[in-house]
Structures are given as C-alpha cells and as structure tokens.
Amino acid sequence: MDQQQLDGFISRYIGMWHEPDEARRRALVQELWAADGENRSRRFDIRGYDAIVARVKHAHDEWVAGKGFVFRPAGNTDAFDGVVKFFWEMVPKDGGPREALGLDLFVLQEDGRIRSLYQFVEPSTN
C-alpha cells in the first residue's frame, strides 16, 4: 500500500464514523471490511457486516451526533505486509481537550479490505 492508498483508506475509515446517513455508513462498512471481518477490543469482539454497522452506529450516535466529538489522526500512520497502524484522537468538534486517544491495528486481506481490526483506547486524562 503506497502513501496515497493509505491516506485514502484512513480518510474513508474516519469518514465512516462521522457519516450521519445510515445507508451510506453501511456502504462504507461494506467497502472497507471483508464480509466476515472482525472488530476487536478488550470490551467487544464482533464479526460481520451487521455487527460492525451496529457498532459504528452506536459510536456515531453517542460520540459524534450525541456529544459533538470528531475523530482525527493523531500521529504517524504506517503500513507494511498487510498491516496498518493508525493513531487517532477524539476531540470536541468546536475545539477543546482530547477526550480519548486510540491505536487501531488493521489486518488487511489481499484486496485491501479489513480482515481484523484491533482497537486500543486510552481515556482522557483531563
């Protein structure tokens, strides 16, 4: 994956969390993930489009639409051998201190879609 492809992947991924339209959000999930892809963290282990769509909807409704936060890159994004490392932060859309910092590790299939996503989230220290 070259830098332009990596930037496009991350842009679509972040856009998915911000997307208010449920049909468009589902389309982004299906574009980004394998049909049996998984999203894992210490709090959940979900698999498949329906579960991932529900997870993204919950996060969007709570953090983006509900509390006015946005997600954005927070550090260097890197990729090799089908693995992507992406640091992100959640901040108020109108400015203010960071609410959360995360590291997402993506394992991609040969077609570039997500096979597995491992999420690590650090809560705010504010």
Please name every model-derived segment:
Residues K57-N126:
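A beta-strand edge to alpha-helix "cap/lid" segment located at domain peripheries
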Residues M1-L32:
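Short acidic-aromatic low-complexity motifs
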Residues R26-G82:
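A solvent-exposed, acidic/Ser-Thr-rich amphipathic alpha-helical stretch
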Residues G15-E19, R43-I46, P92:
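Short histidine/acidic/glycine/proline-rich micro-motifs that form metal-
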